[in-house]
Structures are given as structure tokens and as C-alpha cells.
């Protein structure tokens, strides 16, 4: 089980990413415009740099919603491999069956 502080830190990052998503996209789109001059591009870059560091989607880490484990994460379920296996054996994941061939 991950520390509570790590789980809460990740939740805070997710909130920040959502809060600044629109503004970040607008700034990046404006910077990508080939018709703007260099001074304007530098000003846009400065505005982008003023956004909180944690608001960048790159800083997000996928974590298991049950245990907070950051590794062995399955996107389809939002679970780590340990929790996925445990819940699948108990039949708590609809449509998941043991493999047999």
C-alpha cells in the first residue's frame, strides 16, 4: 500500500492538470502558429512557464485506485497487477475469466 501522502499528491496533480488543461492547450496552439513573430512566441513561452509545474500532464503517474501502487498498472481497470489478480479470482471484475487453451 502506498503512503497516503503519495496518493494525495497524485490526486492534487490530477486536479491541477484538469484546472490548467484548457489554458495550456491554448498557449501551445498559439505557439505552434507559424505566422507569429519571435517576440510574441517568447512571450507565450513565458506565460506557459508561469503555469504550475505540477499542472503538466507529463508529471502524472498512473496509480492503482485500490492500493495506490504505481507499478504494474492496467489502464483498462485502473488496478495494479496484484489487485487485478485478486479481484479476478474473486469474480469481482465482469467479463474477466481465467485463460484456458
Curated annotation (Swiss-Prot):
Pfam families documented for this protein: Ribosomal_S14
One cellular component term from this protein's GO annotations in UniProt: small ribosomal subunit
Coiled-coil spans in chain: none
UniProt-recorded Gene Ontology molecular function terms: rRNA binding; structural constituent of ribosome
InterPro entries cross-referenced by the UniProt entry: Ribosomal_uS14, Ribosomal_uS14_bac/plastid, Ribosomal_uS14_CS
NCBIfam families in alphabetical order: PRK08881.1
Similarity comment: Belongs to the universal ribosomal protein uS14 family.
Assembly, per entry: Part of the 30S ribosomal subunit. Contacts proteins S3 and S10.
PANTHER family, sorted: 30S RIBOSOMAL PROTEIN S14, SMALL RIBOSOMAL SUBUNIT PROTEIN US14M
Known role: Binds 16S rRNA, required for the assembly of 30S particles and may also be responsible for determining the conformation of the 16S rRNA at the A site.
Protein name: Small ribosomal subunit protein uS14
Organism of provenance: Synechococcus sp. (strain JA-2-3B'a(2-13)) (Cyanobacteria bacterium Yellowstone B-Prime)
Organism placement in taxonomy: Bacteria, Bacillati, Cyanobacteriota, Cyanophyceae, Synechococcales
Underlying gene: rpsN
Amino acid at each position: 500500500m502506498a503512503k497516503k501522502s503519495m496518493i494525495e499528491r497524485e490526486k492534487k496533480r490530477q486536479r491541477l492538470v484538469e484546472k490548467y488543461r484548457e489554458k495550456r492547450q491554448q498557449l501551445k496552439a498559439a505557439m505552434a502558429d507559424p505566422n507569429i513573430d519571435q517576440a510574441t512566441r517568447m512571450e507565450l513561452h513565458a506565460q506557459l512557464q508561469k503555469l504550475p509545474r505540477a499542472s503538466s500532464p507529463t508529471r502524472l503517474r498512473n496509480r492503482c485506485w485500490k492500493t495506490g501502487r504505481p507499478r504494474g498498472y492496467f489502464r483498462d481497470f485502473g488496478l495494479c497487477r496484484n489487485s487485478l489478480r485478486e479481484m479476478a479470482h474473486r469474480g469481482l471484475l465482469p467479463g474477466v475469466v481465467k485463460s484456458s487453451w
